[in-house]
Curated annotation (Swiss-Prot):
It comes from Methanocaldococcus jannaschii (strain ATCC 43067 / DSM 2661 / JAL-1 / JCM 10045 / NBRC 100440) (Methanococcus jannaschii). ATP binds at S234, A235, T236, S237, S238, G239, K240, T241. This is Probable ATP-dependent helicase MJ1401. Keywords: ATP-binding, Helicase, Hydrolase, Nucleotide-binding. Residues 396-585 form the Helicase C-terminal domain. Signal peptide: none annotated. A motif (DEIH box) lies at residues 336-339. A motif (Q motif) lies at residues 189-217.
Amino acid sequence: MLIVRKPKKKKDEIEIVKVGGKIEDGIEVKNNQKIFANYKKVGDKYKLYRCRVGDKLIQPSKVLELLKSDKIFILKENEEEIEEVLKSYNLKFDYIELCPFCLLKNIYKRLTRNNRCRYGNLEICINCGINEIKEEVKISEEFIEKFLKRFKDVDKVLSLLRIRNPLDKPELTRYDIITGSEEDKIENYKIDELDIPEELKEIIKSRGIEELLPVQTLSVKAGLLNGDDLLIISATSSGKTLIGELAGIKNLIKTGKKFLFLVPLVALANQKYLEFKERYEKLGFKVSLRVGLGRIGKKVDVETSLDADIIVGTYEGIDYLIRTKRLKDIGTVVIDEIHSLNLEERGARLDGLIGRLRFLFKEAQKIYLSATIGNPKELAKQLNAKLVLYNGRPVPLERHIIFCKNDFAKLNIIKEIVKREWQNISKFGYRGQCLIFTYSRKRAEYLAKALKSKGIKAEFYHGGMEYIKRRKVEDDFANQKIQCVVTTAALSAGVDFPASTVILESLAMGADWLNPAEFQQMCGRAGRKGMHEIGKVYLLVEIGKKYHAKMENTEDEVAFKLLNAVPEDVKVEYNEDEEEEQILATISAGITNRYDIDRVPYIGRAFSLNKILSNLESYGMIKANNDVKLTNYGSAVAISFLYPKVAEKIKEGIIENKEIIKLITEIMPFENVYLSNNLKIKLSKILNINVPSRFFDALEVIREGMEKIKDKKLKEDLTLIIMEFEGVEVEEKILEMIINLRISGKTPGQISKTLYEEFKIQTYSGDIYYYLEQLLNLLDATERIARIFNKRYAEKVKELKEKIENPK
């Protein structure tokens, strides 16, 4: 290939370059590889003369030979004279577009449809566009490239990064729109056409539902109403719950056998319990809830009877009934959020639960509900279920990305989005409401408070709240009394607020970035069929932001990875601790024959049964013959949901008469303890280092830096803190403080306040609430084991447990 062009500022000269290789990637050409030739008009034609390579002159005839030897390309614009020169020698040519910025660096790069962008009046390559933006904005190259490939315009990208109020330019912030698929065009079944009892039809129609949604229709076609086991995969909020209800209530009416509905989180179980109670008690069915109800705070009156027709529960709540052999007469099992199989630790427990349900209730219909995953066929085969795969969305989803300079800017954008959404009333008569996800409970509380101070009706919602408070927030949102709810990323699977808009204030969950499954779940919460015409998602991204030092990527880099991520495969593989727990749980459920234990259809088993049984026998939890017998110790461990090796640690502490606080700290330390932010900032300046946020780490830094602290009051305060923890295990001491404050009658909020006021220790009421709930479960387990090995120890544990649960 030959490229012929006019060099800049040379009126009567052409440049000829021979290019080999992939010119779309850019080829560097040195000056000594270029041929220059002058031209002049003689009569009505042009002639070449004074030709050279560098400083060396060559004959015009040699240049003509070269021009005739290969295909010639010239630039499209302002090259009329070159065209005339080539025509004078009867030379044929085509046109080519080169990046003008690359040419300035002696790089010849062809512009194609995919590698170009606009900059002012010029067309340049994506790489040069990236460099121009990097000159003005500090941002990752990958991030810029994604935007340039989308907008094809440097100025537009710069506008997006600099815009004062991005909400005024939705065409700039909009990343994409996810709409329906071919499946959305199918003819949906009318409710009256379904093979279900008339009373169920009336209940459904009373909710304003006259016909099924696409995924529901596909499920009916796949055998939902014929008792077939199904794995149903579709986006969040696409109508999966009703699928379970159709099968469960139909089977209940026809056979009288129980309908089980399993969910991963207490918050979601509470919501489903109240919904089913309202809907189906009018048919004469009893609905009960099986979850670990909160024991800290006000007690809640809910139905928990096992004689109920419909039982809603968390995975652990239902598994407890199986491990204690108290679950009978099951007709339908619906397991929601089955993609939770991917979760560390919890995935193994869910897999074990599913295996036991499949083995014990072979005749029951199993419906597995999942968000989008990467290996649906494989999972359906493993579950021995028919696959129903729906890729559409009942409501289109707009995804926007907005750049924010700092947390303050994020807060202002959130306020503006919430206000605009609230003013927007859908054709169905609903105001727009927002669901805001952030990385921690503390942050959720802070944002809700900050938004309230700006006149927004906002509430926080997280797992550390008492049931009654959570329920009030749910009701207020459903009744459109509040404009937005701020919740944690960790609760994304358990939040079912009918929001028009989802705002991701952060792309982190705790100390880690969101994974694609979590991100997709959050996005799926935006837009509800019959309430909103469209759902919106806003990613608020701070360029270069990391929430923890261990994070490898920055928030801007993570944003594009999440937006472009493909669904993750669901994979389950037990480690030894997990397999020991699941085999012990199976034996506890009454499956005691070796052959039967081996036939329980787990997905994740990785060890031989003989090895696991041998381990359990060595702990004294079973007696392994052909028919395996569970010991009292094994039973206590199984119903306590403990790893057997952890139970061994507890047993050892009980036998040694170890102090209860010491034993608890070894098994389950309270780790969410921080130095107050004001003190951290002050000390970091004085000591000229970044003082750690975690209290345990910061205390050591304070001890070593005391000599540098000259402020008398500060030194006195720090000395008191150091003396309080001198010569003791800090974790034990803090746990002892928390327990003593609780026993004295303080609420989690009051405990947090006392620790701050007296020791500048920052804790959060939600974390303390959650920890005390988990602590009571651990004390239950410890008491069970102690009843076998040390009854006096058991009494001490029982006494402590009662004091924590029912303080003065």
